[in-house]
Amino acid sequence: TGMVVIAGTGFFALAGGAPAIEIQTAGVAPPFSINLRFGLYESLFVFAVNLAGLLAAVHYLPRLREHAATMLLFIIMLMGIDGMIMTRDLFNLFIFIEITSLATYSLIGFEGRETQLAAGFKYIIATSVATTFFLLGTAFIYYQTGTLNIDDIMARQALIGGPVGQIALILLLASLLIELKPYPANGWGLDVYEAAPGAIASMISVGVSAGVLFALYKVLPLFGDFLTSIAVVGGITFLVSNLIGLKQKNVKRLLGYSSIGQIGLLVLTLALLHKYDQPAHLALIVGGLVINHLLAKAGLFWLAGVVKLDNIGEWSGIAGKSLTLLIFGICLVALTGLPPFPGFWAKWALILELAVDELYGWIALVLVGSLLEAAYLFRWFGHALRRGDTTPVTVPGMDLMPPAIAAVVLAVAGYFSAMHAGVVPMQLFLPVYAAFVLYLLDGLPGRFKSLLMIASVAAGGASVIGELQGVNRIFGIIMAGGGLLVAIATFYRSDTRKGFYPLLAALLLSLVILPGVRTSLEFFFSWEIMTLSSYLLITLGRDAVRPALVYLLFSLGSAFFILAGFAIGYASTGSVELASLGGAGDAVPLIFTLLGLGFVIKAGGFGFHIWLPGAYTEADDDFTAILSAVVSKASIFGLVMVAAYLGVQADIGLDPAYVLGWIGMLTATFGALMAVFQEDLKRLLAYSSMGQLGYIIAGVALMSHLGWVAALYLTVNHFLYKGILFLAAAGIIYRTGTHLMYRMGGLIRNMPLTFVAVMMAIIAMSGVPPLSGFGGKWLLFNAMMDKGWYWLAAIAFFSSAVAFLYMFRILQTVFLGQRKLEHRDLREAPAILLVPQVVMLGMIMLLSAYPRLLLDPLSAAVAPYVPGTLHWDGWALVSHLGYWNAPLIMIIVGAVWAVPLVFLLLMSLSMKIQPVKQFNIVYAAERPDRPEDTHYAYRFFAHYERAIGFLVKPRATAFWSAVGEWSHTLAASMRVIYTGNGQTYAFLILAFFVALYFANGGTV
């Protein structure tokens, strides 16, 4: 505790502007004394390492109390790490490395288990070889410079040269890199992480590695000619370690792969920042990554020690334990570089600096490695969320204190990192604050929490929307007002739904903030909060853990494309302002492609849509309505933003827009075709949502005034009819207990209001007059014909016809036909589910009769980006292809339907009507034994399979499954070197040194 207090006091004093402290021993100046420096960076590392050491000691306290020698060794290890960080003498650095290695070796095997003794033996072999290299290199450097003081060596660096100087530097570099466990010379480290006690493994991961990393930082100026090699070693280690992590199921070994990968990323970062002279960003980037890794990784090691389950598949034992899951989730989220933790701000700054130096290959490596790490970490988290047959784990509350403190410090560090990055935290952190407050109230009744959630979102929306204008205001209203309207439906469930309302508040507030952001950093922060909260909300659904993981991985892939696009925009303009993207010059096509691809993936565009049906189907029914009606609009807003800032101002030409248009129409077509053959009601609606978003994407791609008006008009309509359909589905499933349409039928008698809402939404969605969907399709077809996109217009027409087929199926199989016996007594959907449907239905009817109420504001909103106007003749919208008079169409269609209806009603007064009974059906063979056998809904469109079935074979699913399989196969081949044999590991260490030597110009 004293070490932490002293280090912390010194750090805050230095951060406040105090001068660095120079410590000299023996009463003389260096190089004749041991010289220690306690500057700002040293104090940060010492404070962080000692804090981790204190928490690790608390975690390991029973063993430390049992054996005084263990406590002594633990303190010696900590002091050795502190010495590595503070010393300014090369030989004393060697001494401190040796002290740390010996103490660590003793702690690894102190419990006397066979696996620990074997791991300790491998550890001492590896570190002995490394320190031997270090000592030899130190001797050669002393021979050439005549000093061991690091500062003096830097001043005399010109004296280091020739074969002796080269071998000296390579020996020194190889020693430090081996201590940091580079691939492939790191098998010994993985065995240590797996076998060592959790507290000791955590300190090796975050403490010893931090000390060696700081030692590398101190002597890095000596390696100016080797910086590329250092970056390559770090990059390969980061990428390969995370790739192999995909195959890992042992918890501590998995954490070992992650630790090695994170240190590899830090090595890469140090080398590249030094090579391209970016010292100003060391504090945010390197400091953020170190603190993030130190706290998150240590917290996970300690949590693993508390849970005491070796296989990730057994972690379902903590399902339902909210505090344990919260700590687990915070550490995982931080480790993967998601907001609001320090790793997010550090990776953001790192990617931007790499883009400034046009290091696009390194950007790809960092982002791919980060995606791989997220895959295996969140797979582990998914096991913890899945309630299985595993015996529940009892986790004493006090044992959670060390990882809980780590989680709290991570959150605080994230706040200060945001301030250091120049962000105004209050507005951006609003979703986090709201989620935290609601989490503290999570024990309250569910409906009361729903009320608090709605109030918080309403307050946040009111504070943001008033400042918005134009297109941003339209999306702000959809996301805030629409989100609140659909969220009213959450009242239909009376259970507590722990975790649901805090996450929903975070999601909706992040969506509310999104249209009001001004910089790419603010946009990306809100985007990632939206991604994370929506993922966690999906996991709360039935059997949703696996679909949620697929959703998260595609969402992160989408986010990384967006991040890369923003980074290149910053590199081209020198600004993070979104409005400056149009001035990116020759980089505009690349930025457009990256951002557009990111938003298309998030929208479930063709080829990237495989996450969509599973996520929509397995999420809670009321949340699926929010996911489709509201969350999907974020990607549309992103596309509009890209088109506004790049597609018009930068005049990128037709080609990128035309490609985007084809993507949109392929999405619409294949979404419709795949919906045709679905038996699951929610899955059908999921594919339908995908298809309808395709029309909107195509509208944005048109880059014309009429096209954008059509896209935004369809966006509003998509919110309305998808909100109705998914909420209606929630009510149907709530009453029937099934998703499968062939297990329904005849529900018009039980749920007439739901039937009316669904029927009207289907008419609107299908583009059939007189409702608003017809106007949207009319606008889109006109815009396509104006643009000369005749083939795309034809495909749009075909897709609309297919959409009517599958939507007709919902009416026919769910509401019409014969009713199941068990459904005779079903009631109408809960009233609170019907309220938002009625409101949205009223809006559809209003827009169908008076579309100008919406079209004029839309036209005015897009005019600054795509100049033009809509031509009205009274209430008729006129184009050179014709006109659309919505009120007249409503009157005509109403009359067409009203006249036959009145006639039939009059005829019924004089006719004897006999309702068709369930078994009043002619069969060619035997009479069916059960009512279920009379239902024709199963495989309703089977007769179309022979004609178009080949189009909907799951080729995209097969492709992405193959990508996953190839990744696992490659990972398996990369880890064959980890045999567990100490001699093999020693050989790989020597081979690594030889490779490093020859790669940097060494000769025999």
Residue map of PLM features:
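Transmembrane helix-loop-helix hairpins at membrane boundaries of multipass inner-membrane proteins
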Residues: 1-74, 151-155, 419-504, 575, ...
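Alpha-helical transmembrane segments and their helix-start/interface "positive-inside/aromatic belt" motifs
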Residues: 1-2, 118-128, 321-324, 398-404, ...
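Hydrophobic alpha-helical membrane-insertion segments
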Residues: 2-13, 128-135, 331-334, 406-414, ...
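Juxtamembrane membrane-water interface segments that cap and precede transmembrane helices
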Residues: 23-38, 186, 469-470, 870-883, ...
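Hydrophobic transmembrane alpha-helices and their helix-loop junctions in integral membrane proteins
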Residues: 55-64, 68-71, 79-91, 105-348, ...
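Final/C-terminal transmembrane alpha-helix of multipass membrane proteins
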Residues: 260, 399-418, 690, 843, ...
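Alpha-helical transmembrane segments and their membrane-interface junctions
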Residues: 332-350, 408-422, 762-779, 841-862, ...
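Aromatic-capped, Gly/Pro-kinked transmembrane alpha-helices
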Residues: 397, 420-424, 854-893, 901-1004
